[in-house]
Amino acid sequence: MKFSELWLREWVNPAIDSDALANQITMAGLEVDGVEPVAGSFNGVVVGEVVECAQHPNADKLRVTKVNVGGERLLDIVCGAPNCRQGLKVAVATIGAILPGDFKIKAAKLRGEPSEGMLCSFSELGISDDHSGIIELPADAPLGTDIREYLKLDDNTIEISVTPNRADCLGIIGVARDVAVLNKAPLQEPEMAPVTATISDTLPITVEAADACPRYLGRVVKGINVNAPTPLWMKEKLRRCGIRSIDAVVDVTNYVLLELGQPMHAFDKDRIDGGIVVRMAKEGETVVLLDGSEATLNADTLVIADHHKALGIAGIFGGEHSGVNGETQNVLLECAYFNPLSITGRARRHGLHTDASHRYERGVDPALQYKAIERATRLLLDICGGDAGPIIDVSNEATLPKRATITLRRSKLDRLIGHHIADEQVSDILRRLGCEVTEGQDEWKAVAPTWRFDMEIEEDLVEEVVRVYGYNNIPDEPIQAGLIMGTHREADLSLKRVKTMLNDKGYQEVITYSFVDPKVQQLIHPGAEALLLPNPISVEMSAMRLSLWSGLLATVVYNQNRQQNRVRIFETGLRFVPDTQANLGIRQDLMLAGVICGNRYDEHWNLAKETVDFYDLKGDLEAVLDLTGKLGDIQFKAEMNPALHPGQSAAIYLKDERIGFIGVVHPELERKLDLNGRTLVFELEWNKLADRIVPQAREISRFPANRRDIAVVVAENVPAADILSECKKVGVNQVVGVNLFDVYRGKGVAEGYKSLAISLILQDTNRTLEEEEIAATVAKCVEALKERFQASLRD
């Protein structure tokens, strides 16, 4: 929002300069974006009157004038402006005047005629870009008066960024209130006395959508002169706020908008059929707006209509059919309070953003409408003449915003700001802000003013108190906090520890969106039900993820497209699985997932280029699982997953419960996702692993360990993990280690079979094992394998 500093000082005039005022406004939360003078630097320009105006004898486009500037004689000045005429009051740069750009006025001859000055346009004085003609001043402008003084050009425009919660500052009155509070200065409101009705004319007004329009005021003003010129003082105030003067009626409504923050609209009363109806639009209904464009409306759009058609979009844009034009004599002034939710988003839907919609979307003071319509009526009558009828008020108190009582506790105030502000200061600040305050024991009960929608809870009052008290007035104090030993279960395995291990192994952590493309997700989890968002950011982000693989694989593709072929990444996050038994019907599981692809090692002269395989990822995953202390209970079992290669994947089980998957991405899925080369993934349900087994101290055997190797032949479909597990189970008391060190297929082994070479480590903590005992345990293992898996010792 942009406004004139002098206009603000008409409302409140603290004894501080422009820089201090701008800094104060910024510190109050209304960030000042810029302060600029309203005119260029010049002097020697005064009010004059064109007494004579004749055609230049030697130039068709020049005129020779005699100008009275209040001196002893008339000045001869040559002027080329098309609007120069006898009797016009003008801005005259006299000899010796210095204009913007260090341009000095001197006596000269133009085409043979003497010129003792210059009649100035707005652009020549650095006031605006208007160079279409010389400045036309009011007829009562006093001759010889310095133009800077007459037009009050020793002024600045201040532009501020108003946050959405401070809609009350979208008018001079709101900024003035804040400045008055900060400086403990009185607020000097211009007189806005009620206008006495001189005619009885009214217009029927019906509000069918009371929830969207709790208050609608109208007033008939008859017999106006719509072509009456807008006073220069009003034009200047509008210009300094960035508003172009259009006609007197529109200028008045814009003036009230800027002054009070209340949007208004003027209808041509004679073009309204029957009366005003405030209603919701009919689906597909059209209205031609003031800019000539046609808008097709939805049923959730509030409109101002007459008895036959829509006249405009409520709170956003008026319609062409009922707009004021050069022949208008009778107008209906509209001043309403619209519920912000009934306006929000409607302007953007039609590609519009108006000053009215900007304010209505954020909220207008529901108690402001009477003051605004009285102010507009008085200005309109003073400028355009005419007679005003009574105010037509259609209000629904039940749907108007209610002011809640907010309790502010002393303990909360002190705790949040870390500083004690005296009780009387707190009470004074709240009252100066416009609150109705009741003081209690170590608390205040405050009712926020109608213009402050953002004051709803206790924290809002704390913010207001410290804002007005001044952040700079809060002393720097060392932070004081009690040191309390945090409780941490030894069995808790921190994800931070897991992430550190993966980082050490060359993985990089990524964070991907929980919103994924439902089509891609169906490729990874065909047939799985996912939660679809009713209002997604985009179609490609309209489903909640069922696993972390969607985001991770998309990240791999992104990197491969940028010549990053060796990728090792992981992510921790939630998946969202529809579950009727879960709270709100959605189960949220914390997952740990990772992806690798490309070469096993970074390029190096001493290392061969080898592509990662299943066992690279399995080894990394086992290192992570070992942190849980449950690696001995983990099994990798062949199990189908539609996203994984059927021959290079496995389900991960903790005892008898499946906790994840690992494997190579299915070749068909690789093709559809545009993955380049073999890609391997894993995913674990972390909640089932977060409780680690705390290592138990035990005696280290002083007696020698014994290793025995066996090679058994089993069917191809027998998992090696089951063989190792069986050996551990059989030799539970003496077998302390089992390891698979070779797998052989080929000569000497029948087709459909494989040879597994297993080492058994046998040891006792109390004595040295005898050879007979060792042989018996090995034989027991072989017998168990033969019985369960039909295994045989390889010759």
Swiss-Prot record:
It is found in: Cytoplasm. Residues 701-794 form the FDX-ACB domain. CDD domains: PheRS_beta_core, tRNA_bind_bactPheRS. GO terms for molecular function: ATP binding; magnesium ion binding; phenylalanine-tRNA ligase activity; tRNA binding. Binds 2 magnesium ions per tetramer. One of its GO terms (biological process) is phenylalanyl-tRNA aminoacylation. Its main location: cytoplasm. Residues 39-148 form the tRNA-binding domain. The keyword Cell membrane does not apply. It catalyses: tRNA(Phe) + L-phenylalanine + ATP = L-phenylalanyl-tRNA(Phe) + AMP + diphosphate + H(+). SUPFAM superfamilies: Anticodon-binding domain of PheRS, Class II aaRS and biotin synthetases, Nucleic acid-binding proteins, PheT/TilS domain, Putative DNA-binding domain. Keywords: Aminoacyl-tRNA synthetase, ATP-binding, Cytoplasm, Ligase, Magnesium, Metal-binding, Nucleotide-binding, Protein biosynthesis, RNA-binding, tRNA-binding. Belongs to the phenylalanyl-tRNA synthetase beta subunit family. Type 1 subfamily. Tetramer of two alpha and two beta subunits. This is Phenylalanine--tRNA ligase beta subunit. It comes from Salmonella paratyphi A (strain ATCC 9150 / SARB42). The lineage of its organism: Bacteria, Pseudomonadati, Pseudomonadota, Gammaproteobacteria, Enterobacterales. The gene is pheT.
